[in-house]
Amino acid sequence: MKKVFIRTFGCQMNEYDSDKMLAVLAEEHGGIEQVTQADEADIILFNTCSVREKAQEKVFSDLGRVRPLKEKKPGLIIGVAGCVASQEGENIIKRAPYVDVVFGPQTLHRLPKMIVDKETSGLSQVDISFPEIEKFDHLPPARVEGGAAFVSIMEGCSKYCSFCVVPYTRGEEFSRPLNDVLTEIANLAQQGVKEINLLGQNVNAYRGEMDDGEICDFATLLRIVHEIPGIERMRFTTSHPREFTDSIIECYRDLPKLVSHLHLPIQSGSDRVLSAMKRGYTALEYKSIIRKLRAIRPDLCLSSDFIVGFPGETEREFEQTLKLVKDIAFDLSFVFIYSPRPGTPAANLHDDTPHEEKVRRLEALNEVIEAETARINQTMIGTVQRCLVEGISKKDPDQLQARTANNRVVNFTGTPDMINQMIDLEITEAYTFSLRGKIVEA
């Protein structure tokens, strides 16, 4: 049985893709063994992220570390997948000639054939094309062991924000046909999955073709998935404010399975910076979306992405972001220092903000967000939360770990038969990034 080591960088879409790489290899070889140490593997894969420079350079650092393994085991296959593969292509082979296969997010289904071609010809294989929907037509049926699962409903992005490489590495937006998505979710539900997370770079741009040739939008998809037997909870990641329509907002009013948690990236609170980023909305328009959502779901927890130190960002513009964060009361969020990416329009902008100042802004924004997260955690003490039990606690092997609808980890004392089940937990203690709870007796 082939032994496979895979390291995944970046977003949840990459996590989904990594699972699919393992699936296509398992189908090809009649099963595989996933190992946690690279030196045990017959196949080593790096599923990469190019959103930030540090993530990209870490890939080449990791490749350097596995190079000696290739010298010891000439038959070892080393592969680079994901967005760095799409961006760099043949340059990866030039920089690291011991790499055997390089493939992008849309060609991962071709991995088994690429490995065969490498072994037959002795030549490194590169395929970073964008065949769109073909990938999903060639993936084996989803198999899961947990109570939650990702389902990719669309890929790519056509927004072309000035700082972002996604349209260049994952291609333009394309949606899976509605029936394909529903079949996968129904199959997962039959395997015991309770929670579905619909994935895409911009899920609210979903336009899936139906059997009659009509187009299904994202709000309609949510309503259909809501009625699939066995699915008890729904999430989606990630959405774009520009297409967050009233019909999607109304889903929060009508669909109780849709969790009271939303990740909606704003990036900045400054209209000038948002314009320079080519985001396509203003801070006021973003606030309007949130106001409508919270009128329907007062308990909605909102997370976001922020970039500090975007070229030309002034102190006043940063203060506008800080004020927006306080006004909206963002929950757990991701704050990054701007990282110029080759080939994007923003990479050509003049940047005169010292790195030390960018770090200060990063820390100041994180401080405000973490304080709000801690406040929300405290308000949950004494409440009863419906939770999905994920497995053994990462903090204490004698405890279990569950997740609330608003994306909190709850550690509690339970029994193994509770894993992958939905249970009610009373929150007894709150910490910075987790909660403690106890089972509510029936």
Swiss-Prot record:
Free-text cofactor note: Binds 2 [4Fe-4S] clusters. One cluster is coordinated with 3 cysteines and an exchangeable S-adenosyl-L-methionine.
Residues annotated for [4Fe-4S] cluster 2 binding in this entry: C157, C161, C164
Name of the protein in question: tRNA-2-methylthio-N(6)-dimethylallyladenosine synthase
Main EC class the enzyme belongs to: transferase
Species in which this protein is naturally found: Neisseria meningitidis serogroup A / serotype 4A (strain DSM 15465 / Z2491)
Cofactors (names): [4Fe-4S] cluster
Purpose: Catalyzes the methylthiolation of N6-(dimethylallyl)adenosine (i(6)A), leading to the formation of 2-methylthio-N6-(dimethylallyl)adenosine (ms(2)i(6)A) at position 37 in tRNAs that read codons beginning with uridine.
Keyword DNA damage: no
Pfam families per record: Radical_SAM, TRAM, UPF0004
EC number: 2.8.4.3
